[in-house]
């Protein structure tokens, strides 16, 4: 007999197709089973502080994007993108033989998720590659746009990030249509996993409607879950152009756009390309995240006809706005006002408008012998039927050059608003003009010497300002930084300007400002921005000395002072914190918990869990509460840099109870005597309550932790002070 197994049931079978389920084996799959968040859905999201770590990054630890970009053959890259635009692929045929419209949409939708309220979203990290954005209903077919770009990305590797490539491809598409753009800046660095910190909304179903008024105080940029801005069929697919105006203003306004910029962007974006709705949505398959393995990251496979080209279904709308959809023109406004418009439906059943009594003058994208009548989206007609939008639209109709200029500037703003200061900009096409939304800074005029720095430090030390005041003023200056859009920070000394000097959270810092301004003016050369940070250096060194430790707090000079005219008051007012748990401040009641807002603030400051922990503990014993209060100052030696906060918080001789029904303020009392020893807020007690934060707090409360505590506090402090120093890195 043969030694080989001749059992027919086993012959030729792939072992992976075995139908028998071994539950004990399946249960061992990593990440399977009921999760902590399933059990405790309100659990504090401390994990948000640990995203985008080195462990998820495939690049070398010392990879420097600025250095890699400097090696890029930029003209050749643009030439390759231009060639790609006109190289129609059989697997995804281009409209009119050009991908101009597709690439403009890709760039727009990459940048268009940005919102000014919290500075999150946008194209700055290449998030369109990841869920949920890669699967949003508004991003149907952009998986194909990104896949079309892959040969170019593959050729240039890490010399160009995906985040930069998306926007550059949109710019090149506009230029290839004959449009002159305002410029382009690179500098967006990719990340390697989805952003977890962005609140896209609470809805559980795609395309759930939100009333525009609900967006006023929320960091949401769209009126429906899964859209970039608004429903193109009008609010809740009403088909009413006039009723869409509030939604358009709310969503574009959350990006910092005014009426002129709104009109320019809508019209400019709809001067080129088309929408796709050749058949009913029932033909369209699942999104990329839900697609089977063999789809290789592509989704929305359509069973309608060929599934692409003339049969493509994207939004379900079938609209071509202009007679030259691959060439820049003023036809959008000419058609908008030349014709009366009648409501109709796309082949997919979506509401749109067609020009009444118009000749068929619009070229078909795949049949040169066919022509169509001009068509518009419901929200396009809003630019005619809203009185304020109409005024601007008619001006652009009569003056195409003003439209071109407005769109060029608005497009640059749209695609660069989340990049932060110009110091981050890279490349040969960076515009020279400073724009107010870039939070411009003057050029440095003096680099203070070590001797000058020491002289100013000595004057600060002799000023009579307390440790609390010195540390508070530096924290107030630097802690406005937002890691999302890279706005805020100490550079510019905007703490001394409106609106920051008037914020209630800065009350103590504002009181210390006049003395520090006098010291800075007497020095003659050092900037106020550097002086404010030096105040914190002096305060911390004094506090460490009081603890018996001699340290030199790192200080990097070279900051400059912004002028009031370089500061958009309304825009900067968005940086005013709802809460700053580092200073035991909360401006509003209701909404997220105080500890949730503390995590939010720490995440904006790009802090890790240990950094958050050590900073709060240090700031409490230094007495930096916004109002000078004693909440959370768990020490008998305020002003001394010690680990007392952690020691006393974790001391089991103290029990805690809510001071009132709000459970925002708590009393710590002696378990034996009942004597009240301390008061604290939720931003304090969370370091004993939350298991993850407590784990770090226990390290700093240990008997051998005093030196480590000071070292770690100084390191985290220095990080915050330099968060906005893009000029030196």
UniProtKB/Swiss-Prot annotation:
Position(s), cross-link Tryptophyl-tyrosyl-methioninium (Trp-Tyr) (with M-255): 108-229
Protein name: Catalase-peroxidase
PTM: Formation of the three residue Trp-Tyr-Met cross-link is important for the catalase, but not the peroxidase activity of the enzyme.
Gene label: katG
UniProt catalytic activity: H2O2 + AH2 = A + 2 H2O; 2 H2O2 = O2 + 2 H2O
Cofactor stoichiometry and binding remark: Binds 1 heme b (iron(II)-protoporphyrin IX) group per dimer.
Active site feature: 109 (proton acceptor)
InterPro entries associated with the record: Catalase_peroxidase, Haem_peroxidase, Haem_peroxidase_sf
GO BP terms: cellular response to hydrogen peroxide; hydrogen peroxide catabolic process
Cofactor(s) required, per the database record: heme b
Keyword check for Metal-binding: yes
Gene Ontology CC annotations of this record: cytosol
GO molecular function: catalase activity; heme binding; metal ion binding
Ranges of biased composition (kind: Basic and acidic residues): 15-25
PANTHER family in UniProt: CATALASE-PEROXIDASE, HYDROPEROXIDASE I, BIFUNCTIONAL CATALASE-PEROXIDASE
Function description: Bifunctional enzyme with both catalase and broad-spectrum peroxidase activity.
């Amino acid at each position: 007999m043969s030694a080989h197994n001749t059992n027919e049931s086993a012959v030729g079978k792939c072992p992976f197709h075995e139908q028998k389920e071994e539950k004990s084996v399946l249960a061992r799959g990593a990440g399977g089973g009921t999760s902590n968040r399933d059990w405790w859905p309100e659990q504090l999201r401390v994990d948000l502080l640990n995203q985008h770590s080195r462990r998820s990054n495939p690049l070398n630890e010392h990879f420097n994007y600025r250095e890699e970009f400097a090696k890029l053959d930029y003209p050749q890259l643009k030439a390759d993108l231009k060639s790609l635009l006109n190289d129609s692929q059989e697997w995804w045929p281009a409209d009119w033989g050009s991908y101009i419209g597709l690439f403009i949409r890709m760039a727009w939708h990459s940048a268009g998720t940005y919102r000014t309220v919290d500075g999150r979203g946008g194209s700055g990290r290449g998030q369109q590659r990841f869920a949920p954005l890669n699967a949003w209903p508004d991003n149907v077919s952009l998986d194909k746009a990104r896949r079309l770009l892959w040969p170019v990305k593959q050729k240039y590797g890490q010399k160009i990030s995906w985040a930069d490539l998306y926007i550059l491809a949109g710019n090149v598409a506009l230029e290839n249509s004959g449009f002159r753009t305002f410029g382009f800046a690179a500098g967006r660095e990719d990340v390697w996993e989805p952003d977890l910190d962005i609140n896209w909304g609470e809805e559980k179903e795609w395309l759930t409607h939100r009333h525009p008024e609900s967006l006023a105080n929320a960091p949401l940029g769209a009126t429906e879950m899964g859209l970039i801005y608004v429903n193109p069929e009008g609010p809740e697919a009403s088909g009413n152009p006039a009723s869409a105006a509030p939604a358009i203003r709310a969503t574009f306004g959350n990006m910092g756009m005014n009426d002129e910029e709104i009109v320019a962007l809508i019209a400019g974006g709809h001067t080129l390309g088309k929408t796709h709705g050749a058949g009913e949505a029932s033909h369209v398959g699942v999104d990329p995240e839900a697609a089977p393995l063999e789809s290789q990251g592509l989704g929305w496979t359509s069973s309608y006809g060929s599934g692409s080209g003339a049969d493509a279904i994207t939004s379900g709308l079938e609209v071509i706005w202009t007679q030259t959809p691959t060439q820049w023109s003023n036809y959008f406004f000419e058609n908008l006002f030349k014709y009366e418009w009648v409501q109709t439906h796309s082949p997919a059943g979506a509401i749109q408008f067609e020009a009444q009594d118009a000749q068929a003058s619009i070229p078909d994208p795949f049949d040169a012998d066919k022509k169509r009548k001009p068509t518009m989206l419901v929200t396009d007609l809003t630019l005619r039927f809203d009185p304020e939008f109409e005024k601007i639209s008619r001006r652009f109709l009569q003056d195409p050059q003003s439209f071109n200029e407005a769109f060029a500037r608005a497009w640059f703003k749209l695609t660069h608003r989340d990049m932060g200061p110009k110091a981050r900009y890279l490349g040969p096409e960076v515009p020279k003009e400073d724009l107010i939304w870039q939070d411009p800074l003057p050029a440095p005029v003096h680099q203070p010497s070590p001797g000058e720095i020491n002289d100013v430090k000595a004057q600060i030390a002799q000023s009579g300002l307390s440790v609390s005041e010195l540390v508070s003023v530096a924290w107030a200056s630097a802690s406005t930084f937002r890691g999302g859009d890279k706005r805020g920070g100490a550079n510019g000394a905007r703490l001394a300007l409106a609106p920051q000097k008037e914020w209630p959270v800065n009350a103590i810092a504002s009181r210390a400002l006049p003395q520090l301004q006098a010291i800075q003016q007497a020095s003659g050369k050092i900037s106020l921005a550097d002086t404010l940070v030096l105040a914190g250096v002096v305060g911390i060194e004094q506090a460490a000395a009081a603890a018996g430790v001699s340290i030199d707090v790192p200080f990097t000079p070279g900051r400059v002072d912004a002028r009031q005219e370089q500061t958009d008051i309304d825009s900067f007012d968005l940086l005013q914190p709802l809460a700053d748990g580092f200073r035991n401040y909360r401006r509003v009641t209701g909404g997220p918990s105080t500890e949730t807002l503390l995590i939010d603030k720490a995440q904006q400051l790009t802090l890790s869990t240990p950094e958050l922990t050590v900073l709060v503990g240090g700031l409490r014993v230094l007495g930096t509460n916004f109002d000078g209060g004693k909440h959370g100052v768990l020490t008998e030696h305020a002003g001394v840099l010690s680990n007392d906060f952690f020691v006393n918080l974790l001391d089991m001789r103290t029990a805690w109870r809510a001071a009132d029904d709000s459970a925002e303020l708590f009393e710590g009392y002696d378990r034996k005597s009942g004597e009240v020893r301390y008061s604290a807020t939720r931003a304090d007690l969370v370091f004993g309550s939350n298991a993850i934060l407590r784990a770090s707090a226990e390290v700093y409360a240990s008997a051998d932790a005093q030196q480590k505590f000071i070292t770690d506090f100084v390191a985290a402090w220095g990080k915050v002070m330099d968060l906005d120093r893009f000029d030196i890195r």
